[in-house]
């Protein structure tokens, strides 16, 4: 009996000792790789594993880390899901940090790799350092403002993301809830831009506005045939299951599931289709972040990006909690949540 206790105790101590050694090696590895080498450059890899703004938040993390520690930084987007021709510079200006001449030690940082733990406000402060439109993107954005006759700050906005998010990440919120919340925050609202991937949201809001004589004009750039974006093909299996078993979303999903099944995933689009899809998204998001007041939810990376990138972040409201702002001092990568 005593022997068994001794063996158990010894095994526990040995396991604990090994665990400490592994953690120490990992910690020292990070120090050696990223902090002690003046010739190191961190390469933030944009790949095909996740959505646009999920990857963007992790790239922001890599950028913050490099900027603080004076380490070289650049973006690699050869295999990026949203690459049309070149990659990042299809839509944005190139981004690079250089602190030392001719760095030779490249260290790759992938999606979901967190190099340092930072508060949300740190991410907010550097968004504009990376999110810099190239000339073509600027022109597309100007054309959109002209087409819709919108002036920055003189209209309100609503953002609703559906599509593949309804499989398991998001819960359907009735469109009228967003409208009511917006009118609560701005009773004088007369013009709204709706950014959504599901045209049904637009139709339902138009109907609600007419039925209640709200006297509000609503615009959208959403394709009238779209019932939601599907990023990866495997998400269709999740959506089909949710259309039967997801109590919160199944009623709506079951009514559009065939259209979702017919929707081409972003990963299967050709270069022309990817460019249009991505440019339309960037343009629409720009219209939102330069609105007066925005009502959204924080269930998606896009909406969390909108909160942080908006001209007046305090004017971006979470439909689930209109009276409380986020904690900007919370240490978390926004790709996970607020």
Q: Which sequence ranges carry the predicted segments?
A:
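Intrinsically disordered, compositionally biased terminal peptides
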Residues: 1-43, 150-151, 333-338
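Secretory-pathway luminal glycosyltransferase catalytic domains
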Residues: 39-42, 78-189, 199
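PAPS-dependent sulfotransferase catalytic core
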Residues: 43, 62, 66, 71-101, ...
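A short, glycine/small-residue-rich beta-strand->loop->alpha-helix junction that serves as a flexible
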Residues: 48-57, 167-169
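Conserved beta-strand->loop/alpha-helix structural units within folded catalytic cores of enzymes
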Residues: 52-65, 284, 291, 297
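Histidine-anchored nucleotide/phosphate-binding helix
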Residues: 56-68, 175-185
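Donor-binding and catalytic core of enzymes assembling or modifying cell-surface/extracellular glycoconjugates
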Residues: 191-319
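Leloir-type glycosyltransferase catalytic cores
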Residues: 321-338
